[in-house]
C-alpha cells in the first residue's frame, strides 16, 4: 500500500523488508564509518518493525540507544528527474547516509521526513544507511507510553527504537509538487486547495479535477506565479441535497463518510511533469452553547481510547488490514471515534478512519518532564504533525498535553501554564479547523473542551464509591467541583468557561481471558460480570445531564494492562453486539 494515501504517486519504490542491522552500544559507528561498511552489520531486521518487536526478526527487549541500518537498492532515474527518499517515522533521532555521504538529520520520533538524494547517487547499486539515536533514559524526549526504564510496568509499555514506519523512494521531475493542503469551508460549500512546489518554475501550470463518486464537480488550470498556488472550488454549488440540510448530503460524518477525489497535474510546456491523487471530506467541527457540533449539528462523541500497540509489532501494525480491523471492531461495538493515545499514528490508519467514518483525536507522544529541551521538541513535532495530517477529515481534535505529562507542576506553576496556553494558541494558529484541548484530564488552562478523567466507579460491591461517581457526573456543576483526582479540573487562575464537558477517560474494567498477569482499574471474573459492570459504569454516564460525550478506556489489552474490550491480539472478550447495545442506549436528548 502506498504510505501516503493523500499524496499518492505512481512512480515509487518500497524499501520495507530486510535490512542489515547493528547495535552500537559503544558509539563507534560514526568513527568507524559504518555507513560505508556492510560487514559492520551482524544482524538482519525486517523494516519497519523495531528490534524490540517479534516481527522485526530480532525480538530483543534490552535497551540499545544507538542502532544502525544498511541496505542497497537500484533506482531508475533520468537526468531530468530527482529521487526523493521518505521515512514515515524513526524514533528518535535519525542520521541518513547515501553512498557514504551524510544527507540529512531529523529529530522527532513520530513524524515523517524526506530528503532529495539525487546528487548523492552513483552508477549502478546505491547504499543507504541510517543511524538511529534513542536515549531511552532521557525523560525530555516525547516518548508517550514508551517506558524509560528497562521493563514495562503500570501504564508504560516496551520502548521502541529506530525505524517504525515505512521507508520509500519516489522518482519525480526537477520541479514537483512538494505539499498539498485541503481545507473544507463547510458553511460556504467550497474547498480550498493549496499546493507548494519544490521550486518555482515559470510557465508551470496546475491542472485540477475534483470529483464526487466519479462525477466531475470542479476542474480548472492555474498558471504559477510563485512556488505556491491556491484556489477555491465550489463543491455544493447551492444544491440543497449536497448540503446537510436534509440528511448528511455530501458532508463527511462517521455515519456517512462521503469523500471527494482530487487529481493534480503539474504541466510545463504542454507536458505533464508531476501527477498525484488525493482526497478530502467536507467536515466542520466547532463548539457552541456547551455542545460539540459536527457540520453545524449537535454531535455526541462515543470514543474509545486506542493505544495503537500490537503484540507482534508494538507501535507498528502487522499489516494495513490491522488498521482497518481495529476501526471496524470499534464501530461494531457502537463507538464513533477514538482518542489515538500518546501516539501519532501512521497515515494508513487515518486513511481508513477517513474511508470508514471514524472520528480521531490526534495526540503526540509526551515527555515525562518539563524543560527547555522538551518544549522545543514538542513544538517541532507538533508543527510537523499538523503539516502532515491537516487534510484528514477524520481528525477533529488535537490533544497536545495529557494528564499534565511533561508539565507536572501546571496546577500551580505559571511557567508551565504559559506553555499550555502557548500550545493551545500555537495549534490554533496552525490549524483553524479543529478543536484543541489544553491538558486532557485535569488542571486545564485555555481549552475548547473540558476533558475530565474519572476512574473512581469502584467495584460492584463498593456502592458508596459508585454513588459518589454517579453523582459527580450528574451535572456540569458537580463535574467541575467534585474532584475525582488529587488535582483540580482547572489550573490555578483558570476556570470553567461553559465549554462542552466530556468524560475522556473512565472505565478500564480489568478482565483477564488469557491467563497473563495484569491489572485494570476494577476487575471482573467472567463475561456476564463484565457486561453487568460495563452497563453499571455506562449507566452513570448516561444519567448525566452535564456530559457531551465520552471516551472509554480502552480498545485492547496492552502488555500488562488487561482492561481492554478486546484482547491484545484483538479477540473479543465478550459479545460485541452486547457492548453495542449498551453504547446505543444513549441519545442526545438526554443531555441538558
Name every feature range the model reports, one short phrase each.
Residues 1-340, 352, 381, 396-397, ...:
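Secreted/periplasmic carbohydrate-active enzymes, especially glycoside hydrolases
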Residues 337-570, 578:
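Substrate-binding/catalytic cleft of secreted carbohydrate-active enzymes
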Amino acid at each position: 500500500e502506498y504510505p501516503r494515501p493523500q499524496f499518492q504517486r505512481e512512480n515509487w519504490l518500497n524499501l520495507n523488508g530486510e535490512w542489515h542491522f547493528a547495535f552500537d552500544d559503544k558509539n563507534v559507528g560514526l568513527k568507524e564509518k559504518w555507513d560505508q561498511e556492510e560487514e559492520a552489520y551482524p544482524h538482519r531486521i525486517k523494516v519497519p518493525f523495531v528490534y524490540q518487536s517479534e516481527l522485526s526478526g530480532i525480538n530483543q527487549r534490552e535497551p540499545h540507544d544507538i542502532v544502525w541500518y544498511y541496505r542497497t537498492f537500484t533506482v531508475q532515474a533520468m537526468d531530468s528527474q530527482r529521487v526523493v527518499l521518505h521515512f514515515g517515522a524513526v524514533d528518535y533521532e535519525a542520521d541518513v547516509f547515501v553512498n557514504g555521504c551524510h544527507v540529512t538529520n531529523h529529530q522527532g520520533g513520530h513524524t515523517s521526513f524526506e530528503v532529495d538524494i539525487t546528487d548523492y547517487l552513483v552508477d549502478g547499486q546505491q547504499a543507504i544507511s541510517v543511524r538511529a539515536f534513542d536515549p531511552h533514559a532521557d525523560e525530555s524526549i516525547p516518548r508517550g507510553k514508551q517506558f524509560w526504564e528497562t521493563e514495562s510496568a503500570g501504564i508504560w509499555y516496551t520502548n521502541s527504537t529506530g525505524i517504525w514506519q515505512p521507508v520509500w523512494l519516489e522518482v519525480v521531475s526537477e520541479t514537483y509538487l512538494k505539499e498539498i493542503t485541503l481545507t473544507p469551508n463547510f458553511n460556504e460549500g467550497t474547498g480550498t486547495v493549496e499546493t507548494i512546489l519544490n521550486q518555482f518554475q515559470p510557465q508551470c501550470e496546475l491542472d485540477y479535477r475534483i470529483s464526487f463518486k466519479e462525477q466531475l464537480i470542479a476542474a480548472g488550470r492555474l498558471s504559477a506565479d510563485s512556488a505556491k498556488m491556491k484556489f477555491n472550488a465550489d463543491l455544493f454549488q447551492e444544491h440543497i441535497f449536497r448540503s446537510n440540510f436534509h440528511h448528511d448530503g455530501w458532508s463527511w460524518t462517521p455515519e456517512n463518510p462521503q469523500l471527494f477525489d482530487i487529481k493534480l497535474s503539474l504541466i510545463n510546456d504542454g507536458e505533464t511533469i508531476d501527477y498525484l491523487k488525493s482526497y478530502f471530506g467536507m467536515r466542520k467541527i466547532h463548539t457552541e452553547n456547551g455542545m460539540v457540533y459536527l457540520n453545524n449539528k449537535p454531535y455526541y462523541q462515543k470514543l474509545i481510547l486506542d493505544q495503537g500497540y500490537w503484540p507482534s509489532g508494538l507501535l507498528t501494525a502487522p499489516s494495513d488490514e490491522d488498521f482497518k480491523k481495529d476501526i471496524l471492531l470499534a464501530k461494531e461495538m457502537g463507538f464513533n471515534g477514538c482518542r489515538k493515545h500518546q501516539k501519532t499514528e501512521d497515515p494508513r490508519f487515518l486513511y481508513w478512519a477517513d474511508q470508514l467514518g471514524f472520528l480521531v483525536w490526534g495526540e503526540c507522544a509526551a515527555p515525562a518532564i518539563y524543560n527547555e529541551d522538551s518544549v522545543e521538541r514538542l513544538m517541532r513535532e507538533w508543527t510537523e504533525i499538523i503539516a502532515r495530517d491537516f487534510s484528514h477529515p477524520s481528525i477533529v481534535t488535537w490533544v497536545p498535553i495529557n494528564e499534565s505529562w511533561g508539565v507536572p507542576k501546571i496546577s500551580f506553576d505559571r511557567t508551565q501554564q504559559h506553555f499550555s496556553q502557548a500550545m493551545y494558541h500555537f495549534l490554533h494558529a496552525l490549524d483553524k479547523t479543529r478543536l484543541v484541548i489544553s491538558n486532557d484530564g485535569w488542571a486545564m488552562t485555555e481549552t475548547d473542551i473540558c476533558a475530565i478523567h474519572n476512574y473512581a466507579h469502584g467495584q460492584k460491591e463498593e456502592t458508596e464509591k459508585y454513588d459518589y461517581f454517579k453523582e459527580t457526573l450528574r451535572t456540569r456543576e458537580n463535574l467541575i467541583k467534585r474532584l475525582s483526582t488529587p488535582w483540580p479540573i482547572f489550573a490555578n487562575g483558570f476556570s470553567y468557561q461553559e465549554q462542552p464537558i466530556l468524560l475522556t477517560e473512565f472505565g478500564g474494567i480489568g478482565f483477564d481471558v488469557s491467563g497473563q498477569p495484569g491489572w485494570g482499574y476494577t476487575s471482573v471474573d467472567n463475561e456476564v460480570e463484565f457486561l453487568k459492570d460495563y452497563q453499571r459504569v455506562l449507566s452513570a454516564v448516561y444519567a448525566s445531564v452535564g456530559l457531551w460525550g465520552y471516551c472509554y478506556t480502552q480498545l485492547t489489552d496492552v502488555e500488562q494492562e488487561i482492561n481492554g474490550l478486546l484482547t491484545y491480539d484483538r479477540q473479543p472478550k465478550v459479545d460485541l453486539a452486547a457492548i453495542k447495545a449498551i453504547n446505543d442506549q444513549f441519545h442526545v436528548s438526554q443531555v441538558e
